[in-house]
Each structure stands twice: as C-alpha cells, then as structure tokens.
C-alpha cells in the first residue's frame, strides 16, 4: 500500500483516486466534474523535494576502491572494468546515483538483487548486474540480527495453457546465502512422470512438484558461495510504525500535507473555474414557440424549443438581449435587476490559493526541518539561515550514509561474484557535518587561501 501511494504522489498515476466526494454538499455528477477539472501539482512538489537529495551523489565525498597485497593494481583495474557494465552501458556508481534515489522515492521497501548469468569461469569473470524487486514481488524474507537470511521473490509470466483462464504462470526465486533456487510453474502436459501432491519428484535437471493442481519445476543455480544473500533493501529511513522492520520514503513526513494539497488544489481548480465562468442569474422571457405553455405542448409532450423550461434561452454571454426603448424615461428597466453574474468571493479564492502555497512550503519545511525553501528566508537573520542550512544537511547526511552503505554492498557483491574480493578495500566516506557550501562561501574560501599564501 505504501508503494502504491508513493507511486501516485511521484508519478501522478492514479492521483484522482485520492480525491474524495464531499457527500453533504457535492453530488456524484459534480464530483466527477471536479475530478475532470483538477490539475494535480503534488507531483511537482515531490519532485522538488527529491531533487534536493541529488546533492548527495554530487557532494565532495571520498571514494576508496583499492586492493591490498600482490597484483593489487591489476585486480582493482579488473574490478573497475567489471563495474563499468553493471548497469548495461553505465557503471555501478551511476546506478546508485540514479536508480537508488528514484526507487527510494517510489518503493523503499523493494530490494535490489545482484545477479550474474552463467559464464565460463576458465575464460572470463562473472558480469554482475542489478535485478530490481518491487515490494509486491518480495513475498517473504527474514532477518536475524539485522542480517538478511533469505528472500523469496514471486513474479508472473505468460503461460498460455487451457487449465489457466488468465494464461499467467507463477515463478518463485529463493535467494539464500550461498545459492539461489528457482521454482517455475510449467505446463502439466509436458510432464510424463507420475506426481504426488506436495512431494518433490527428482529428475536429471531438477525436481517436479505438484501443488494445488499446479505443476512446478525446481532448479538450483550454481552456488555462488558469497556467504550472504545477494540482496539489499532499497530504503534507508526506517519506519517507526513497524518498529524499524520496513522503510519509508525520504519525503514520508510530508505525506499528510501532500494529501491535503491534493484535496485543496482540487477545490481551488473548481473555484477558479467558477470565477472565470460565474453563475448567471437572470429573468427570462416566456418561450414563444407555437403551442408551448410553460414548457409543455397541448398533446402533453415537451417543447422542443425551450426543452421544457418555458423560457427562451441565451446560449452564451456574447448573445445580446434586446429591449424596446420606452417613450417615457420612467419606464426604463434597470438592467442590473434582469441579469447578474455571481462567482465565489475573491476572498475565498485568495484563501485557497494561499493555503495551497502554505502546504507546498510546509512539505519542504517538514522534510528538511528548515524554512530555507520558502520566501521567509529572505528576511531571516544570518544565524537563522545557517541553522536552517545545518538542518538540511543533517537530513542529507542520513541519505549519504544510506548511499554509501548501498554502494559498498553492490561493490562487494560484484567483487565476490567476479572473484576479485581478496584484499579489497571499498567504501565511500562523507564528512560527518556534511557541509555543502554555496558559491559565495567557496569564493570566500579561495580568497582566504590566496591571502594565506602571501
């Protein structure tokens, strides 16, 4: 559920489903019309928040990747070469800098499994790559003392057989500390061996299993003997609701305000539409169609001209209503009493607009514990601005620790699979205060350095 909500807030896909009808004052038709008119801004807000976290991979951290002992330079160069194709044509560093933050925004409870395809270990090294597992696909996993013991992943694939109405088969991958097992549903017609319910039947290449009238085939991959499950959860911020057993997105503290903004922004859109296209109140002349009497015809039918209203209608505000000029000025009609346009009070529009703006600023302030992203910083004191910036950097430092931990895990798994982990020293080092200086501060530092040289 959390992943579904995060995806809506980040991508906008399904955001309309978050809108709720105000039953006491809004009919079903009026609600549908409001949904059509709503242009969501919450995706812009979440992107604006997440963009700040991209300062982490752009910060000045220390990247240590080296081997100690014999042939150290050659082994490091080979590991860098293996890492260069970790993400297709992009390297491992680029994967963490890009996808890790993207997945934290939409599905922090997903996993990334480091895998490799079969290879000839006499002639080449393994080429590890990331396999992304959504939180929906991670159907079972277990931790002991914060160490992942196993991960079970369920995926679906096309299985066009008569016994399955949906033509979809299930595949289960069980990632263990030294090997991986795969249980895939197959067509029962391809099995010639007698099977017994819930009992494995060994064959030359694997084992058959009959379960709930479904037939599966179990295979074991070549043991990787890494000594740990080659999977790591995406998230780095632990969820207090689950006592730290699951994770939340970096902007999770702003979710209540984001949901409020979905509602308020929708109401503002309908209010603005009513302001631009106000309600028209007017006295209408009687329908002049032959046989029309208060919208009804003599034979009992509805008048086709006035559609049963009994009045002549005006199709748009550009139409003109003509009145004969009276001879006596006292007989002139006050036109303001015949036609008037009524829209929402401008105070209501301004209130809603300010409310949306305040919610947007509040989202950023809550995530970073700072007012640095609002107009209020303009009139703030220098000390206050420094404190605000420190709060932002504290938030980013938590992200930096998760970033470094994730990078290190991927590098070590890649080195293990490529048989290049002996003597490896790999880590990212961020400054504990995580100071990100602005341009003016950097210029001041350079000027101070020049003065010290004189």
For the regions a language model picked out, list residue spans one by one.
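Extended, charged amphipathic alpha-helical segments
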Residues: 227-378
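Extended, helix-rich architectural segments
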Residues: 1-149, 153-156
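Generic detector of well-ordered alpha-helical segments enriched in charged/polar residues
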Residues: 3, 20, 32, 47-50, ...
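Short amphipathic alpha-helical segments that mediate assembly, nucleic-acid/protein binding
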Residues: 2, 15, 193, 439-442
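Alpha-helix initiation/capping motif
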Residues: 46, 76, 176-177, 230-233, ...
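Extended, regular secondary-structure scaffolds
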Residues: 92-248
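Glycine-centered flexibility motif
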Residues: 108, 134, 295, 308, ...
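Long amphipathic alpha-helical segments
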Residues: 311-454
């Amino acid at each position: 559920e959390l992943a579904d909500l995060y995806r809506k807030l980040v991508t906008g896909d399904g955001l309309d489903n978050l809108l709720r009808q105000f039953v006491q004052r809004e009919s079903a038709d009026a609600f549908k019309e409001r949904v059509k008119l709503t242009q969501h801004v919450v995706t812009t807000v979440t992107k604006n928040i997440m963009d700040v976290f991209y300062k982490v991979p752009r910060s000045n951290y220390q990247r240590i990747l080296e081997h100690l002992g014999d042939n150290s330079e050659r082994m490091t160069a080979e590991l860098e070469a293996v890492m260069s194709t970790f993400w297709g044509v992009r390297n491992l560093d680029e994967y963490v800098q890009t996808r890790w933050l993207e997945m934290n925004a939409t599905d922090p409870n997903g996993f990334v499994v480091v895998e490799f395809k079969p290879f000839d270990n006499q002639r080449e090294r393994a080429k590890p790559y990331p396999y992304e597992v959504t939180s929906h696909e991670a159907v079972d996993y277990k931790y002991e003392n914060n160490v992942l013991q196993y991960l079970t992943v369920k995926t679906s694939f096309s299985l066009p057989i008569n016994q399955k109405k949906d033509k979809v088969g299930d595949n289960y991958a069980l990632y263990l500390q030294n090997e991986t097992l795969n249980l895939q549903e197959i067509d029962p017609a391809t099995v010639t061996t007698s099977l017994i319910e819930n009992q494995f039947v060994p064959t030359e290449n694997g084992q058959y299993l009959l379960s709930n009238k479904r037939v599966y085939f179990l295979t074991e991959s070549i043991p990787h003997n890494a000594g740990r499950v080659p999977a790591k959860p995406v998230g780095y911020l632990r969820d207090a609701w689950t006592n730290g057993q699951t994770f939340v997105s970096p902007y999770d503290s702003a979710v209540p305000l984001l949901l409020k903004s979905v509602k308020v922004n929708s109401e503002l859109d309908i209010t603005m539409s009513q302001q631009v296209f106000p309600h028209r109140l007017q006295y209408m002349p009687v329908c002049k169609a032959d046989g029309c009497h208060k919208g009804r015809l003599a034979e009992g039918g509805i008048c086709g001209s006035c559609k049963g209203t009994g009045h002549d209608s005006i199709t748009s505000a550009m139409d003109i209503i003509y009145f004969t000029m009276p001879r006596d000025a006292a007989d002139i009609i006050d036109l303001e009493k015949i036609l008037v346009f009524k829209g929402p009070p401008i105070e209501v529009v301004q209130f809603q607009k300010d409310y949306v703006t305040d919610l947007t600023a509040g989202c950023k302030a809550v995530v970073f514990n700072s007012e640095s992203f609002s107009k209020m910083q303009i009139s703030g004191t220098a000390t206050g601005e420094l404190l605000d910036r420190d709060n932002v950097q504290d938030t980013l430092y938590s992200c930096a620790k998760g970033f470094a931990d994730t990078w290190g895990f991927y590098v070590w798994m890649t080195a293990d699979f490529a048989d290049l982990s002996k003597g490896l020293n790999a880590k990212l080092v961020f400054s504990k205060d995580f100071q990100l200086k602005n341009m003016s501060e950097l210029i001041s530092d350079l000027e101070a350095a020049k003065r010290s040289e004189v």
